[in-house]
């Protein structure tokens, strides 16, 4: 524990992204492979391939044109994937390698809306927004058929399951189903029974029966031998997909007799099983209230025994096909993330509130996702109790809910409460014990909700349903929306922050006003108590963070640095630093003592609404309007250890370099200096070589024995030396060796040689001119010396 405390108390200097939870499905088609191990789905310009077991994105396929994907299909043999983009290009992929094997024009005059393979994985049919249907041979790489006659967008194509019959079915805006013969290259029949768009076509195993579904709330059974409708089944909902079930008993689905049964998915948000002969619904899932629950897609993987359904809010649900037991849940797109929290005693899970009534709980180890239903409108805020298993949520539906995660990681609602008259925008849990909740609302009031002891003593999942909470105290606190509430570490104080530009301090449990913090120029988004000192932090839309003293309500410090609203603030490093997030998508780390912004982190592209720190203070979690949830890891100690190791390595190498120079082992000394990537050190070695009596030969021998990458580095260093007249001689000496012994063609293949030559030429010319002038001056001095010699003095006469 002492080590943990010491680690928490150190100043942090940097965070690094540990992992991201990003959107992988934004609507459109989804498809399982035959084994049920891979899931293919569209996300804008990419087709993402998910590993069903782990939930991780294995590969993202994006066409060269980088346009939105409008349609795709996987061949029945799971070998070929074809995608169509808005640029009217078709791409054939070897998806397991992630490579494009063929790219060709769709020849449609408008984007491709749908496509489907035939059972042999040889033919591909494409339906376009131009009303045309085309058939392609993907093995021989040519177009085989072009069918016209469909009015409007062709949004559905399907091949007959018997490849010998060579029949293609399509449906367009006229609500009819057209049957095309590939042999006769003509339309055999137009099947009319629907009065609204046909949404799916599926075939029986023997190929004699076809089921069609539509938004006209009916499903039609067709006899493909006579091409006539044999039965119309009213299903009382707009159907987006229908699936024929295998003709075998499935008691858990209500299939107890032989005969044709099918499953529908539609706007009621529940899967239902129907008996075709009687038109009865023999099994139905429980319906869930709230928007976004409508089912938009459903597909069956027969070999894997899996059924996949997709909801309107982009959640993917994987069921056991024989029992409809839920196996997996995937959150494809979270839209705008409004709040995030670590969950579990060891912060092993993450709970996310997005622009949806559903909560999403992710296991950080396995990436498994749970989707929690309960609220009927958008969830706005979250908070977690001290032990980590119990957490609370509040929403626009004016209610709050309490959830508990059991030891196996399953989460269930254990309590709910209502009483506010407007959206509940903020919630905070008690800090010492799991005893109460505090909520703030757009009705300008704060409510205190005690948790009954019976709730705390019971396990997860009450047989009688969630416990109903009653508010113990209600207080009108501000004149505008309350954006944030915070409970002090001792559970005796409450802070509120509002759009009225003030924060207020209250005494619990009676909510008595103690004082007001005034000073911000715009509304407050967040208030937080320091875990160590009697200090309150406030974050405002004016782009500042302020620290306030609880004793006299004075402003102690103001932190400026965000260019936009500061949305969240949290204390880290035992209250000595702050972590803040803003609407500019940035995360900032501050040291309180000197008002310094230590680090600015950028991993989001929009407003960062959610910010939470782990129990050990070594990780942080952020969620933003760009649909991303980012997990950050404190890398301060790792970076410090890395820097220390680098310094020690530099000292050792410097000592080794000095020893090599002393021993006149120039080749190894030069190689070591180059590996250090220090031009001045390399210059020192070159100067030592040139001081040797046999400098020319030794320099030439040493340079020529270097590897090519070392010569490239040496050439770059020469550019730096050549800019200084004191070091240009060493640069020119090295350059002379290279030019004399390396062929021009070889030199031109060096990495960065052109940039090096551009840097060498002007300074070399300048040095040449300077030396030429010096040579002229020296020659002139020599000339003057020879011409200014004094004549010989006359010899003195001999003495008489």
UniProtKB/Swiss-Prot annotation:
Pfam family, one: WD40
A GO molecular-function descriptor: U3 snoRNA binding
PROSITE patterns to which the protein is assigned, alphabetical: WD_REPEATS_1, WD_REPEATS_2, WD_REPEATS_REGION
InterPro entries linked to this entry: G-protein_beta_WD-40_rep (IPR020472), Utp13_C (IPR013934), WD40/YVTN_repeat-like_dom_sf (IPR015943), WD40_repeat_CS (IPR019775), WD40_repeat_dom_sf (IPR036322), WD40_rpt (IPR001680)
The entry's keywords: Acetylation, Isopeptide bond, Nucleus, Phosphoprotein, Repeat, Ubl conjugation, WD repeat
UniProt cross-link Glycyl lysine isopeptide (Lys-Gly) (interchain with G-Cter in SUMO2), position: 407
Self-association state and partner proteins as the record states: Part of the small subunit (SSU) processome, composed of more than 70 proteins and the RNA chaperone small nucleolar RNA (snoRNA) U3.
Stated name of the protein: Transducin beta-like protein 3
Species, as recorded: Bos taurus (Bovine)
């Amino acid at each position: 524990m002492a080590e943990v405390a010491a680690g928490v108390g150190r100043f942090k200097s940097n965070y690094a992204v540990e992992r991201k939870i990003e959107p992988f499905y934004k609507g459109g088609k989804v498809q399982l492979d035959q084994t049920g191990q891979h899931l293919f789905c569209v996300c804008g310009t990419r087709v993402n391939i998910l590993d069903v077991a782990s939930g991780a994105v294995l590969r993202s396929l994006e066409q060269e044109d980088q346009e939105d994907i409008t349609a795709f299909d996987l061949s029945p043999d799971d070998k070929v994937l074809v995608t169509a983009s808005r640029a009217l290009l078709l791409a054939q992929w070897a998806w397991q390698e992630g490579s494009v094997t063929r790219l060709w024009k769709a020849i449609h005059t408008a984007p491709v809306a749908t496509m489907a393979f035939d059972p042999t994985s040889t033919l591909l049919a494409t339906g376009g927004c131009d009303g045309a249907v085309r058939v392609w041979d993907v093995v021989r790489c040519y177009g085989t058929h072009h069918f016209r006659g469909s009015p409007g967008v062709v949004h559905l194509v399907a091949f007959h399951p018997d490849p010998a019959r060579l029949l293609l079915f399509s449906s367009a805006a006229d609500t009819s189903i057209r049957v095309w013969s590939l042999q006769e290259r003509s339309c055999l029949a137009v099947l009319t029974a629907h009065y609204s768009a046909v949404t799916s076509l599926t075939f029986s195993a023997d190929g004699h029966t076809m089921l069609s579904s539509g938004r006209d709330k009916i499903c039609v059974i067709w006899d493909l031998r006579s091409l006539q409708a044999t039965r119309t089944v009213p299903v009382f909902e707009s159907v987006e997909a229908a699936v024929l079930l295998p003709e075998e008993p499935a008691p858990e689905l209500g299939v107890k007799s032989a005969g044709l049964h099918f499953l529908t998915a539609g706007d009621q948000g529940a899967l239902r099983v129907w008996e075709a002969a009687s038109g009865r619904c023999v099994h139905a899932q429980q319906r869930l209230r709230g928007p976004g629950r409508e089912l938009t897609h459903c597909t069956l993987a027969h070999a894997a025994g899996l059924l996949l359904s997709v909801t309107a809010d982009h959640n993917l649900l994987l069921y056991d096909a024989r029992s409809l037991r839920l196996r997996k849940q995937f959150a494809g797109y979270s839209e705008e993330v409004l709040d995030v929290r670590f969950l579990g005693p060891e912060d092993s899970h993450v709970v996310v509130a997005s622009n949806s009534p559903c909560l999403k709980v992710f296991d950080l180890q396995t990436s498994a996702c749970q989707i929690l239903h309960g609220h009927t409108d958008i969830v706005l805020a979250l908070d977690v109790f001290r032990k980590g298993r119990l957490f609370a949520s509040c929403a626009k539906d004016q209610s709050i809910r309490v959830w508990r995660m059991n030891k196996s990681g399953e989460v269930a609602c254990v309590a709910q409460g209502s009483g506010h008259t407007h959206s509940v925008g903020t919630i905070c849990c008690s800090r010492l014990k799991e005893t109460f909740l505090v909520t703030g609302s757009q009705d300008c009031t704060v409510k205190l909700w005690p948790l009954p002891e019976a709730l705390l003593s019971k396990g997860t999942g009450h047989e009688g349903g969630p416990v109903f909470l009653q508010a113990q105290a209600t207080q009108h606190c501000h004149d505008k929306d309350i954006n944030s509430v915070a409970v002090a570490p001792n559970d005796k104080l409450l802070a509120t922050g509002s759009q009225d530009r003030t924060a207020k301090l209250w005494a619990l449990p009676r909510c008595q006003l103690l004082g007001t913090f005034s000073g911000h120029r715009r509304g407050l988004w967040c208030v937080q108590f320091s875990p160590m000192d009697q200090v309150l932090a406030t974050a405002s839309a004016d782009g500042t963070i302020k620290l306030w003293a609880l004793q006299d309500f004075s402003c102690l410090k103001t932190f400026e640095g965000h260019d936009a609203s500061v949305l969240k603030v949290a204390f880290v490093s035992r209250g000595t630093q702050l972590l803040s997030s803003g609407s500019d998508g940035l995360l900032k780390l501050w040291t309180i003592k000197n008002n310094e912004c230590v680090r600015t982190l950028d991993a989001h592209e929009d407003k960062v609404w959610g910010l939470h720190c782990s129990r050990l203070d070594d990780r942080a979690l952020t969620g933003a309007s760009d649909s991303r949830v980012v997990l950050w890891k404190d890398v301060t100690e790792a970076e410090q250890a890395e820097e220390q190791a680098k310094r020690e390595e530099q000292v050792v190498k410097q000592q080794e370099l000095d020893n090599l120079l002393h021993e006149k082992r120039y080749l190894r000394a030069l190689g070591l200096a180059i590996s250090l990537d220090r031009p001045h050190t390399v210059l020192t070695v070159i100067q030592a070589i040139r001081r040797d009596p046999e400098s020319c030969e030794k320099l030439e021998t040493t340079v020529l024995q270097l590897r090519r990458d070392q010569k490239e580095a040496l050439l770059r260093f020469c550019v730096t030396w050549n800019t200084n007249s004191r070091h240009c001689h060493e640069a020119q000496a090295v350059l002379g060796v290279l030019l004399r012994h390396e062929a021009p063609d070889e030199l031109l293949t060096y990495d960065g040689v052109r940039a090096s030559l551009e840097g060498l030429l002007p300074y070399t010319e300048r040095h040449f001119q300077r030396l030429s002038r010096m040579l002229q001056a020296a020659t002139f001095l020599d000339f003057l010396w020879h011409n200014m010699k004094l004549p010989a003095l006359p010899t003195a006469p001999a003495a008489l």
